[in-house]
Amino acid sequence: MAKRWYQEHQRDPWRRQAKNSGYRARSAFKLKQIQDKYNLIRQGDSVLDIGCHPGGWTQVAIEVVGMDGKVVGVDLRTTEPIPGAALMVGDVMDPLILDLSLIHI
């Protein structure tokens, strides 16, 4: 089972495209599709990415908000640093983590 999953994972064109584009996850392309269709995030916006690990959506959000915007990512798991984002480890339901997140925004 694991061998078959690995082989399919290696052949996945979205995974390869994400890697070639510098995105941490193939899910980055899903946010790009949503953004193209609904324009949810705008230049200069502040974004709180809840459950941000591994960071693909955070990377896309940074691209969209630009230099005037802010992106904060929160996850229970440690996420490797992403230039342009403030990343936190913790549960966003914890009032302290939520307050710290909002301070950055």
Model-derived segments and their meaning:
Residues 54-66:
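Conserved SAM-binding loop of SAM-dependent methyltransferases across substrates and taxa
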Residues 91:
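Conserved acidic residues
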Residues 2-42:
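Class I SAM-dependent methyltransferase Rossmann-like catalytic core
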Residues 78-85:
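Short loop/helix-cap segments at secondary-structure boundaries that form the rim of catalytic
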Residues 96-101:
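Conserved Rossmann-fold cofactor-binding substructure of NAD(P)-dependent oxidoreductases
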Residues 44-53:
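Conserved class I S-adenosyl-L-methionine
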